[in-house]
Amino acid sequence: MSINDKPIGFFDSGVGGISVLKEAFKLLPKEDFLYYGDSKNAPYGTKKVEEVKALTFNATDFLMNKGIKALVVACNTATSVTINDLRENYDIPIIGIEPALKPAVELKKGGKIIIMATPMTLAEKKFANLMDLYKETEDIEPLPCPGLPELIEQGIVSGDVIYNYLKDKFSKYDNEKISSIVLGCTHYPFIEKTLKEVTYNKACIIDGSFGTSRELKRQLKNSNMLREENRVGKVTIFNSREDKDIIDLSYKLFNMK
């Protein structure tokens, strides 16, 4: 098999990275994708750094053994902790994801920028460096959201539980003064509709899925690794929990409009 015909690997701590996979599949419809969700060990955002690193390398090895030509780490926490180590150890293009703060700033809407993310993403040096670029000129507030990925892992993406969780998180803010909400965890796009309800659709909601997918395409094109055959690609999903329910949920989220 030529390298062009090999699949692209996607990895996340659970089902969240499927939000990025959806964007990548739209952008690269000829490609085959292998997705590995580590729902057995989700969430990563409250674990110790060394544990996240070990789990990320295990997932990467799983996908490398399937013969992938590139890897997308579709997990903000794993990216912030492990992306440099992965690039040093594997000789394929490796693309990570981080909170899309730059696009929020470039909107130039004024007002407060809220960054929703896991506690670990917000605590890592990579995020601190990102904040340093803008904190002098922008009103940016990190908003840790422990427990939210766990709800989404259960398939709870709407309804009273999600609404009340978000209502409580945003109760301290004046919605009129929020310009943008950056979704700093790949699980969060699945609750975007409820988030808009809670904030009365006042803020621009931004996630990094498209930017990450565009970077994947750019790197594959520059390396002459894009699939050239005129075909429709396929998506195959694996999960460390190894039960039908989580696989069914994964495909449901992939096909969710």
Swiss-Prot record:
It catalyses: L-glutamate = D-glutamate. SUPFAM superfamilies: Aspartate/glutamate racemase (SSF53681). The keyword Cell wall biogenesis/degradation applies. InterPro entries: Asp/Glu/hydantoin_racemase, Asp/Glu_race, Asp/Glu_racemase_AS_1, Asp/Glu_racemase_AS_2, Glu_race. The active site is at C75 (proton donor/acceptor), C185 (proton donor/acceptor). GO terms for molecular function: glutamate racemase activity. One of its GO terms (biological process) is peptidoglycan biosynthetic process. The keyword Amino-acid biosynthesis does not apply. It comes from the Bacteria. Provides the (R)-glutamate required for cell wall biosynthesis. Belongs to the aspartate/glutamate racemases family. PANTHER family: GLUTAMATE RACEMASE. This is Glutamate racemase.
